[in-house]
A protein has these predicted regions:
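Beta-strand->loop->alpha-helix junctions that form or flank phosphate-binding loops
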Residues: 58, 78-87
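Short beta-strand scaffold segments in enzyme catalytic cores
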Residues: 89-93
Length: 115
């Protein structure tokens, strides 16, 4: 029997300017998904371990995109509960040289808090 690792947490939509541009220097944002526990599940799946991710996500297209992102790395998403209205968002501006990175969180009224 294969052992499985189960992670539980919040996956968030990350919006970031391309490269090392600042928010006000760019009119496009790159969208990806991340979060501590989701990142662990993906890393374990990349090492060939059975990893399961548990969370709550809305039933709309952004929630499904988060599920699809996890599945694309081989993470088992069958225990994700669907419901609520919001996915957490964070905006990340990568630092360059002496300028540090900037991270702004928008986590109000998340689906996960009602699990």
């Amino acid at each position: 029997m294969n052992k499985r690792v189960v992670t539980f947490g919040e996956i968030m939509l990350r919006l970031a300017p391309n490269g090392y541009y600042r928010f006000f220097q760019n009119d496009q944002l790159q969208a990806t998904f991340g979060g501590g526990e989701a990142n662990v599940a993906v890393s374990l799946a990349n090492y060939g371990l059975d990893s399961v991710y548990v969370t709550k996500l809305p039933s709309h297209a952004i929630g499904q995109a988060a599920v699809n992102a996890l599945r694309s790395f081989g993470v088992d998403t069958s225990h994700i509960v669907r419901g609520g209205d919001r996915v957490g968002i964070y905006f990340l501006e990568k630092g360059a040289s002496q300028r540090g990175s900037v991270c702004i969180y928008d986590r109000a009224h998340l689906s996960l808090i009602h699990i």
